[in-house]
Design a protein with these regions (language model features):
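Glycine/tyrosine- and acidic-biased, solvent-exposed loop/turn segments at the edges of beta-strands
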Residues: 1-175
């Protein structure tokens, strides 16, 4: 650790660590921040740069199972304003360890195909996005694997449901 950094550690009443935060010489969060549940199990790890979330963030359930993982990226505009957005893949899991959802972000906007799953592992939704809005055919499956609905979106606006016997593979999708 740099001699110009300070570490602040907070504890729960039972003596377990609650959080560990590093600060730079300007008093802003810098590096890895870790939070724990009162039980002592790790709750979250997030990286900071000059007080702003930057890089990998991981959350866990109190049981120790991974809950969520994403990345943050910091941007600065021409006026010097700083923004932090999700950037890259975001994944969530059920406490059982089964994947719950997965999507991708580009400068804070969801893009491409977002998927959600039932805890059984069966896909629940496939949702196409283009620059943060729904665009293309959104498909919903039942837990048994049967397609329940197909809705067409264009630039974020619903254009209606497709007939259930229609093959969505032939419908135009997000590119």
């Amino acid at each position: 650790m740099d001699k110009n950094e300070d570490v602040e550690i907070e504890y729960w009443c039972n003596g377990n660590k609650r959080s560990e935060v590093r600060y730079n010489c300007n008093g802003k969060e810098e590096g890895l921040r870790t939070d724990w549940y009162e039980s002592g199990a790790k709750e979250r790890e997030a990286h900071y740069k000059n007080g702003i979330a930057e890089g990998l963030r991981t959350d866990w359930y109190e049981s120790g199972a991974k809950k969520m993982e994403c990345r943050n990226k910091t941007w600065e505009d021409r006026l010097g304003n700083t923004y932090t957005n999700l950037h890259g893949k975001k994944t969530e899991w059920y406490e059982s360890g089964a994947k719950k959802s997965e999507c991708k972000y580009s400068t804070g906007r969801i893009t491409g195909i977002a998927n959600t799953w039932y805890e059984s592992g069966q896909i629940e939704f496939e949702i196409p996005f283009k620059i943060g809005v729904r665009h293309g055919v959104e498909i919903k499956w039942s837990e048994s694997g049967k397609i329940e609905s197909e809705d067409f979106y264009e630039e974020g606006r619903s254009k209606g449901k497709l007939p259930l016997n229609y093959t969505s593979k032939n419908w135009p999708t997000h590119k």
